[in-house]
Design a protein with these regions (language model features):
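Bulky hydrophobic segments
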Residues: 1-150, 157-189
């Protein structure tokens, strides 16, 4: 991982800041937060998909819609992360689900705005889907940055919605199971 940041630092300085921040966040989550291992595993997979998709294997350029899958999966994984972090602090499960969903969509909005300004001010080519070889100085744009931004935000919304529906279903199922176990306890007495 450190190699990735160093490699990126010399080739794409602005992106290395992103990778470094993501690595620090992953280490913080692992060492400081008490979250379920499944949630941590999902966040780790997301981190590795970003690294391998961009740097090592170029999966963004090889596998069609790899970027789109990451946006769908990332919103689900990060919603789950925020749910796990704030589960003990917010007692209402519905508000907790809505809070997690809203935070993730807000982060996505900030990220897409950052991509827009990074592309327009620093010509970093963060938005859009491009084809680029090692020697390419001007990548070929496959999907425009505006279209890419809309699809990214839509897929993050869909991933967050899948999280919300799943979390609501699991919350209701858990309540029903708790209610049924209380009834069984009363019948046994």
């Amino acid at each position: 991982m450190l190699f990735t940041i160093i490699y990126d630092l010399f080739h794409f300085p602005a992106r290395s800041i992103f990778w470094g921040a993501e690595l620090i966040l992953a280490l913080f989550i692992y060492y400081k937060l008490k979250i379920p291992s499944g949630t941590y595993f999902a966040v780790l997979v997301l981190f590795l998909m970003n690294i391998f998709g961009e740097i090592f294997f170029g999966l963004f350029y090889i596998i069609q819609n790899f970027d789109k899958f990451i946006h769908l999966f990332s919103s689900f994984a990060v919603c789950t992360l925020f749910y796990s972090i704030f589960e003990k602090k917010i007692s209402s499960k519905k508000i907790l689900i809505l809070f997690s969903f809203t935070i993730v969509l807000s982060i996505e909005l900030i990220w897409e705005i950052t991509e827009y300004f990074a592309d327009n001010w620093f010509h970093l080519i963060l938005a859009g889907v491009h084809i680029a070889g090692e020697q390419a100085f001007k990548p070929i744009e496959m999907v425009s940055s505006y279209e890419d931004t809309i699809y990214d935000m839509l897929l993050n919304f869909i991933g967050g919605t899948i999280f919300a529906i799943t979390a609501l279903f699991l919350t209701r199922t858990k309540k029903k199971l708790a209610k049924n176990s209380k009834k069984e306890c009363h019948h046994k007495v």
